Amino acid sequence: MKDLQFPVGISNFEKIREGGYYYIDKTNLISELLSGGIAEVTLITRPRRFGKSLGMSTLANFLDIRKDSKQMFEGLAISKNTELCKKWMNQCPVVFFSFKDTDGLTFESAYGMLCMKLAFAFQDYQFLLDDDAISDDDKGIFKRILGRTASMDETKSCFLLLTRMLEIHFKKSAVVILDEYDVPIAKASSNGYYSQMLDVMRAMMSTTLKDNISLDFAVVTGCLKIAKESIFTGTNNFVSDTILSPRLSESFGFTQADVDQMLKDAGLESQSAEIKAWYDGYHFGDADIYCPWDVISYLRDFQYGVAQKPKSYWKNTSDNAIIRSFIDYAGDNITTKLETLMAGGSIVQHIEENLTYDYLHSSEENLWSVLYLTGYLTKVRDKDLADSLPDGCSALMIPNAEIREIFETTVSKWFDDSAKAWNRSPLFDAVWSGNSEALTKEMTKLLRMTISYHDYREDFYHAFLAGIFTGAGYVVESNKEHGEGRSDVIVKDIRNGRVAIFEAKYSKTLDALPDACDAAIQQINDRMYAADFRDDYDDILCYGIAFFKKRCMVRKK
């Protein structure tokens, strides 16, 4: 493998270019945004880890009047558009601010973090304090923001102030670039101070974007398009580019051509199929897209010998709480759809693009929309659809192996947590009393409460069996060597000197359950699973269990 510097976790365009990091050219984003009629406000939404921050850093470096960016962009696609470069490169005062990490368990701590981030950002503009054309009143507010003593009203109007001061100084209206605008609202929704943070963000957006005579245009990014009436009230000439939009569809994330080039440059063409299975599968507008964070993380790890096989990088960047809350909300209808998705199928749903964080969990439709818009699901391509869809509906699927693993891990954890809360005493009593009929009844009852994955293969039932005994004071072993073979699940009640041995079989039909049960018992006998326990346990109970979807049959040896 060739030694390349992959910019994992680096979203600063200038640092990537000057530091010699590997870069996939996405500067056509600039052409797309600046060609033709420019919207006063453009909102771009993409899932996390798809390059939004790097895209905004690229745009800011291109426009910033205080920089000389010609060398930074030399050799890139945008440099070939000489007319556009002459008109726009380093011609605009720029306000570039990211709301990333604006978080806190309380409103006070989150607001304090916001004020600190604003103070750091304003340090880059202290040259404005030396301009005699700017009023002392404006300079006073600027200094209070810098010193974190500004009133809340002054904080809400901070970008209005900054654009006005920049216009006075440069005699040009300013471009405002706001990255991850919805992070403070999302965190507030999770931590119980939604209305307070919404009030701050709505006022900040309104003062910056509405009737601001010092604003040339603005670009705002986030994960979700919050309903206009919630946060962008009164904003005129407002354009949104979501994952449904064809424009900018290749500007965030890697195309197949991008990945092919990366693998060629790295000398890793042999990894193409695995990378595609794990990190491809997103369909944005008209484009098929890979998650860029995953691809460069995998290539970096492969380069340094950290990982030779693909793994989930997404799950390490968030707690994936949206899936868990979705499962907790699940009724029978949602459960059936989740099982279809996790078995590799697709479901048809209406997608609501205009959401508010306080109503994300208010309906099944909203929950499916959030899973789609945040990248946990993707659209089935039109050419792959067997039938036409109702207006406003999309066929949704899990995009790749990485996201499927996240779903499976979350479902497994949900089952383990849920099982501890269920009344399992009747099931345990049936196990230790040798009552196979009662055990059949209790097992079936619990099966109907689960969300299956692996398309009802035996590994699902192994996980189910082990999970219902976990956290109940027993020692649970799964697929350890015993006797002359491998028993599926062993449950040891050491205090009472007893052990239960379970062998599970999957039946292809409901009618075949008895035969599958008999086969499980026969295997216990033939492979002598009980032999290892005769010296240490007084009671050894052996059960053959046969499963068919969410039905089971238990027989005792």
Put a short name on every predicted segment.
Residues 1-66, 70-81, 446:
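Walker A/P-loop-proximal flanking segment of P-loop NTPase domains
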Residues 8-17, 102, 109, 113-156, ...:
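Conserved P-loop NTPase mechanochemical-coupling segment
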Residues 9, 14, 64-127:
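P-loop NTPase motor core
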Residues 122, 158-169, 196-216, 529-532:
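Substrate-engagement module of ASCE P-loop NTPases
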Residues 170-194:
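Conserved P-loop NTPase "ATPase switch" module shared by AAA+ and STAND
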Residues 183, 193-234:
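Sensor-1/coupling segment of RecA-like P-loop NTPase cores
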Residues 228-233, 241-300:
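Amphipathic alpha-helical segments of the small helical/lid subdomains adjacent to P-loop NTPase cores
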Residues 238, 290-528, 539, 553-557:
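Extended alpha-helical interface modules used as scaffolds for assembling large macromolecular complexes
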